[in-house]
């Protein structure tokens, strides 16, 4: 439901939605907000069938926008979507963890939780 974005000059922050904190995609992702790069997309409202995992806000803008969510189609197909993805976002450990976990979730696999797997992906 993209209908615009805020200026890339505004600092943007993202955080896990507390009601989604136990979702498998957020396994190992910190709950503190972190700075993201690029511009914050305006996508509200999202479909009622989605599960919003993270929201973001641009400095000086009160409206929070979904930045990561999931949906499961009528046939059971899993979808993960994020509006994050500026090249600098890939330097953020929590973003990489979320992205990795989303791939495992969509493939109906459990993300490895051991330290070696974590380090190879996300540190």
Tell me the role of every PLM-derived stretch:
Residues 59-65, 72-123:
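Extracellular ligand-binding/catalytic regions of CAZymes and related secreted enzymes
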Residues 2-76:
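Catalytic beta-strand/loop cores that center a nucleophilic Ser/Cys/Thr
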